[in-house]
């Protein structure tokens, strides 16, 4: 397994599409998925490879002068629980710190709504994120937005 930082926007789009389309439990809304794909091109982007096959990625989005957001992350289901997401995060966090950011945030569906998102919440907590705030209707009333934060 190797983690690389990608700079080519076409490659970022292709990786984002292939992985998000394989994860409909988390990325099943076509419009949202297309937005993630489109936005990936100019973001700080990290990709995990098994040989030459992309198996996971994440990208960061600046949300303030001192804050970056772990904007989207996906790891193919057959590669879950192998440390890939954690390694992607560690490299992204290190890069964000070197770039001068002091804080990182991530948004997900609030714990207790869907089993898939409960595991996502537990993963972010295990990385050291802390609960910051819930926006009950930011996305819609069925998907309350949990914001987690951490110091970098």
Summary of predicted features, one role per range:
Residues 43, 143-148:
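Short hydrophobic/aromatic beta-strand or adjacent loop that forms the aromatic wall/cage
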Residues 73-81, 110-112:
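A short, internal acetyl-CoA/4′-phosphopantetheine-binding micro-motif in the GNAT/acyltransferase core
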Residues 96-115:
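Conserved GNAT acetyl-CoA-binding A-motif
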Residues 86, 111-134:
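Conserved active-site alpha-helix within GNAT-family acetyltransferase domains
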Residues 81-94, 122:
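Conserved acetyl-CoA-binding loop-helix of GNAT-fold acetyltransferases
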Residues 47, 53-61, 67-74:
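Conserved beta-strand in the GNAT
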Residues 1-30:
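Short amphipathic alpha-helix that is part of the acyltransferase structural core
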């Amino acid at each position: 397994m190797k983690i690389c930082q990608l700079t080519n926007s076409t490659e970022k789009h292709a990786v984002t599409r292939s992985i998000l389309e394989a994860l409909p439990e988390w990325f099943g809304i076509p419009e949202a998925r297309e937005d993630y794909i489109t936005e990936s091109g100019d973001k700080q982007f990290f990709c995990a490879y098994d040989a030459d096959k992309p198996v996971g990625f994440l990208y960061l989005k600046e949300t303030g002068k001192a804050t970056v957001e772990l904007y989207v992350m996906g790891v193919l289901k057959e590669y879950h629980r192998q440390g890939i997401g954690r390694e992607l995060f560690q490299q992204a966090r290190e890069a964000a710190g070197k770039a001068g950011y002091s804080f990182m945030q991530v948004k997900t569906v609030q714990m207790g709504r869907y089993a898939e998102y409960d595991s996502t919440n537990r993963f972010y907590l295990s990385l050291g994120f802390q609960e910051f705030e819930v926006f009950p209707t930011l996305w819609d009333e069925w998907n309350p937005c949990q914001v987690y934060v951490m110091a970098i």
